[in-house]
Design a protein with these regions (language model features):
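Short, well-ordered beta-strand elements
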Residues: 151-167
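Short, surface-exposed loop or secondary-structure junction motifs
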Residues: 1-146, 150-151
Length: 167
């Protein structure tokens, strides 16, 4: 550890890969199977983590990059990790998840949108940034991998969420 938990903040995608492995050990299931069951329970039928990075994903938006040279090319997916990324979804499924977050009494959903208990850090929760944006309480996070970018910004008091997806 770099510091005592709850005293400092250092973002690391690797932590989510470790968490996925812990879930596998505790449940005895592959992380992709466990998460698929979670999404299916919410009726998010078009959401899953990539299992085979060369596999066909129906209606997938292809990633593009100009590699800094001004000419756009489709970007190959060259890695596959679970926990920190490579989650595919649709706007329909994101809306289902958002409604669940806004209306849920699920303790995990509620805690994920608040600062970590007994922590000196008040601008980060369980995987989510907690800040004021345009004078309003905002809960947000982005995701970036070569050729893709996503951003979700939630204004809970207004029951407003903005999704930005690009490739």
């Amino acid at each position: 550890l770099q510091f005592k938990p709850g005293k400092k903040y250092s973002y690391s995608n690797s932590n989510y890969n470790v968490l996925a492995r812990i879930i596998e050990k505790v449940t005895g299931e592959k992380f992709t199977d466990y998460s698929k069951s979670f999404f299916d329970d919410l009726n998010m039928l078009e959401t899953s983590f990539v299992e085979r990075y060369m596999g066909v994903i129906p209606n997938k938006a292809s990633p593009y990059s100009d590699w800094g040279k001004g000419e756009w090319w489709e970007t190959p997916m060259v890695t596959k990790t679970n926990g920190e990324g490579f989650l595919y979804t649709t706007l329909r499924d994101q809306l289902i998840f958002e409604k669940e977050l806004q209306n849920s009494e699920n303790d995990l959903f509620i805690k994920s949108q608040k600062p970590i208990p007994e922590s000196d850090i008040k601008t980060y929760g369980f995987g989510l940034k907690l800040e004021d944006r345009i004078g309003r309480k905002a809960i947000h996070h982005d995701g970036v991998t070569l050729g893709y970018h996503s951003q979700t910004i939630r204004f809970p008091n207004e029951k407003l969420t903005i999704f930005i997806l690009s490739n």
